[in-house]
Curated annotation (Swiss-Prot):
Residue stretches of biased makeup (Low complexity): 231-244
Domain writeup: The MORN (membrane occupation and recognition nexus) repeats contribute to the plasma membrane binding, possibly by interacting with phospholipids.
Cytoplasmic compartment spans: 1-723
Annotated segments matching region Disordered: 230-252, 451-603, 624-677
Membrane topology: Peripheral membrane protein; Single-pass type IV membrane protein
Modified residues (Phosphothreonine): 451, 471
Protein role: Junctophilins contribute to the formation of junctional membrane complexes (JMCs) which link the plasma membrane with the endoplasmic or sarcoplasmic reticulum in excitable cells. Provides a structural foundation for functional cross-talk between the cell surface and intracellular calcium release channels. JPH3 is brain-specific and appears to have an active role in certain neurons involved in motor coordination and memory.
Modified residues (Phosphoserine): 440, 457, 475, 506, 699, 706
GO cellular component terms, semicolon-separated: endoplasmic reticulum; endoplasmic reticulum membrane; junctional membrane complex; membrane; plasma membrane
Consequence of gene disruption: Mice are viable and fertile, but have defects in balance/motor coordination tasks. Jph3 and Jph4 double knockout mice exhibit atypical depolarizing responses, irregular cerebellar plasticity due to abolished crosstalk in Purkinje cells. There is hyperphosphorylation of PRKCG and mild impairment of synaptic maturation. Exploratory activity, hippocampal plasticity and memory are impaired and there is abnormal foot-clasping reflex.
Listed transmembrane segments: 724-744
Gene: Jph3
Source organism per UniProt: Mus musculus (Mouse)
Name the UniProt record assigns to this protein: Junctophilin-3
């Protein structure tokens, strides 16, 4: 029983149309994964039969199908190229026509696995043709190349080699390419005409100077040695001009060549061996009949111009190479051995031949082989002509099949509309992707625009808000704000835009309060720390850091008052500035049963070099609440090396200079905590604190000592600094010794 409807696949595709036994049957429209690609037409038990397939790029196929592949006959439109003909299991062939809609270049013949193979005819945009054998998309075997009149032939300037018949033709965007060309003038860019290869007067340069012997030239060319020439030599100047102009021709292509996208099949590295060519009449044509290898004239063959210039003999890569005979329009001949279009031994015009008997024998054999190859090539061209006519018939049938496929596609759209009126037909799958892509771009914009606002607004923590937690890299302490029960006094209103603050917090365990100390440092070029972004309800994150130069990690702990807070979503800014990593670990003192926060220092405990602090002692309480929130590790990047920001200990100025980079050219402003008073009664409120400012002092940030126990670790860590200095000095001495031994 046949029915129909709409079915959406998990991969984003959909089918709307008729089906039978759970398979597409009848007429319907199906889109590929994520809406890419679309087939509209007739179906038979889950497989396409006749219809139109459209790719997201706009390429289309109209024709018959079998077992999910293009099979039978159909028309493919791909860029500027259109293929009409037979298809076999998804590939072009056996007979078909591929044509460029822009300039009329085309191939008509047999195909195999999607490439020209067998016999066929290639027509170029200027009207020139090749008829003969093909193998793997290239001319190979025997064939005939016929050019158009010289005045109409395509001008070729590029030294690259491609053709509409080769594998590389897929990237030409429908441009017709012209092989079989050679440079016409050695002192100019690699200018040539499509189908013209013969070069007359190959000995014109040789006869100018005896010093420029052919054997010497061929030897130097083969060994790729530098030739010493006089700067005043005409040949030297012309060679330089040729090299310069060839480079210019590489980068600047004429509009004619650009429109045709035609290239030549010569190796232009040896363009200097080519010689000056006489002016060719605009009506002159050239024909090559013979062997081909790898899309080039190679083997034996005959090339002849309509003005009487003719060459019979051996070829290699579109050049005369081997034994052959050259006949000039005036009837004179030149025969012997050629290398890269240059006669290196044999009989020249008006010259006494050398070793005439042996050379003449080899030349005669080469000429006979060339004539035989020409005869075979003409036979192959006739076979190619018959294959061409058969391919044209298949192309006509493909046009008829394409029209039927379009009609089936129209019926399929009507059927899909009946089963699902809300179904929207799209020409290709691009529309299916665009909404999601645009949405993702908008999300990125929102995140990127919101980030600078948080960076430019460092504020003290207020209840119910998320602290910025951005502190300068060179600050001795990190910010670990606990959740206060009341709002602390606001920060001074007189600070500048470039001021940065760091907070230092101590917790009063019993009173559920905390004491915050605000440190201000001027200069806006600090590398800033940030909290990682957490979801609501996540435990508080604790930053962590590793000591410089492999020093042991000192532990210290903080705790909150039970408030869960999200962090500042700025984890990436720090990482981009420096490769330093930090790690914090939690630690509990063995001698203290309480797991509270860090204690404040006594005013007479240590004399700080950079900050002046005056604090009054806190009242000790009997009990301490348990730490209920696990600490999370945070990894961030430092600015110049490993810095132990989590170490609450004092450092000497000399150690700070070695381990900490200067924060900025501006001097930091030091704030002194004048007084800190606690009430006698335990109250659940924030401890009162005041801030007073002292004049700026030229100093570097230092770290505070929180526990007496870390004093022992301080000694061990500070003792490693001289060792590092000694190691660096020894390393420098070793490098200097190596430098002296090897380079002096």
């Amino acid at each position: 029983m046949s029915s129909g409807g709409r079915f959406n696949f998990d991969d984003g595709g959909s089918y709307c149309g008729g089906w039978e036994d759970g398979k597409a049957h009848g007429h319907g429209v199906c889109t590929g994964p994520k809406g890419q690609g679309e087939y509209t037409g007739s179906w038979s038990h889950g497989f396409e039969v006749l219809g139109v397939y459209t790719w997201p790029s706009g390429n289309t196929y109209q024709g018959t199908w079998a077992q999910g592949k293009r099979h039978g006959i159909g028309l493919e439109s791909k860029g500027k190229w259109v293929y009409k003909g037979e298809w076999t299991h998804g590939f072009k062939g056996r007979y078909g026509v591929r044509e460029c809609t822009g300039n009329g270049a085309k191939y008509e013949g047999t195909w195999s696995n999607g490439l020209q193979d067998g016999y066929g005819t290639e027509t170029y945009s200027d009207g020139g043709t090749y008829q003969g054998q093909w193998v793997g998309g290239m001319r190979q075997g025997y064939g005939v190349r016929q050019s158009v009149p010289y005045g109409m032939a395509a001008v070729i300037r590029s030294p690259l080699r491609t053709s509409i018949n080769s594998l590389r033709s897929e990237h030409t965007n429908g441009a017709a390419l012209h092989p079989d060309a050679s440079p016409a003038v050695a002192g100019s860019p690699a200018v040539s005409r499509g189908g013209f290869v013969l070069v007359a007067h190959s000995d014109s340069e040789i006869l100018k100077s005896k010093k420029k012997g052919l054997f010497r030239r061929s030897l130097l060319s083969g060994l790729k040695l530098r030739k010493s020439e006089s700067k005043s030599s005409l040949a030297s100047q012309r060679s330089k001009q040729s090299s310069f102009r060839s480079e210019a021709g590489m980068s600047t292509v004429s509009s004619t060549a650009s429109d045709i996208h035609s290239t030549i099949s010569l190796g232009e590295a040896e363009a200097e061996l080519a010689v000056i060519e006489d002016d060719i009449d605009a009506t002159t044509t050239e024909t090559y009949v013979g062997e081909w290898k790898n899309d080039k004239r190679s083997g034996f063959g005959v090339s002849q111009r309509s003005d009487g210039l003719k060459y019979e003999g051996e070829w290699v890569s579109n050049r005369r190479h081997g034994y052959g005979c050259m006949t000039f329009p005036d009837g004179t001949k030149e025969e012997g051995k050629y290398k890269q279009n240059v006669l290196v031994s044999g009989k020249r015009k008006n010259l006494i031949p050398l070793r005439a008997s042996k050379i003449r024998e080899k030349v005669d054999r080469a000429v006979e082989a060339a004539e035989r190859a020409a005869t075979i090539a003409k036979q192959k061209a006739e076979i190619a002509a018959s294959r061409t006519s058969h391919s044209r018939a298949k192309a006509e049938a493909a046009l008829t099949a394409a029209q039927k496929a379009q009609e089936e596609a129209r019926i399929a759209r009507i059927t899909a509309k009946e089963f699902s009126p809300s179904f929207q037909h799209r020409e290709n799958g691009l529309e299916y992707q665009r909404p999601k892509h645009q949405m993702s771009c908008d999300d990125i914009e929102v995140l990127s625009t919101g980030t600078p606002l948080q960076q430019e607004s460092p504020e003290l923590y207020r209840k119910g808000t998320t602290p910025s937690d951005l502190t300068p890299d060179d600050s001795p302490l990190q910010s670990f704000p606990a959740s206060p029960t009341s709002t602390p006094p606001p920060a001074p209103a007189s600070r500048t835009k470039m001021a940065h603050f760091s907070r230092q917090v101590s917790v009063d365990e019993e009173r559920s309060g905390d004491i915050q100390m605000l440190l201000e440092g001027r200069g806006g070029d600090y590398a800033r720390n940030s909290w990682g972004e957490e979801k609501a309800g996540a435990s508080r994150g604790i930053r962590s850091g590793a000591l410089r130069s492999g020093q042991p990690t000192e532990d210290f702990r903080t705790r909150g008052s039970g408030h869960k807070q999200p962090g500042n979503p700025k984890p990436r800014e720090r990482r981009t500035e420096s490769p330093t990593t930090f790690s914090w670990t939690s630690h509990h003192r063995a001698g203290n049963p309480c797991s509270g926060g860090p204690k404040l220092l006594e005013p007479d405990e240590e004399q700080l070099s950079n900050y002046k602090l005056e604090m009054k002692p806190l009242l000790r309480m009997d009990a301490c609440p348990q730490d209920t929130h696990p600490q999370r590790r945070r990894h961030s990047r430092g600015a110049g090396g490993d810095r132990g920001f989590g170490l609450q200990r004092l450092r000497s100025k000399s150690q700070n200079k070695e381990n900490l980079r200067p924060a900025s050219s501006a001097e930091p402003t030091v704030q002194k905590l004048e007084s800190l008073r606690l009430g006698d009664r335990p109250e659940p409120r924030l401890l009162r604190w005041d801030l007073t400012f002292s004049p700026p002092q030229k100093s570097l940030p230092v770290a505070l000592e929180s526990d007496e126990e870390t004093g022992d670790e301080l000694k061990s860590s500070t003792g490693s600094a001289p060792i590092l200095v000694v190691m660096v000095i020894l390393l420098n001495i070793g490098v200097a010794i190596l430098f002296i031994n090897f380079f002096i």
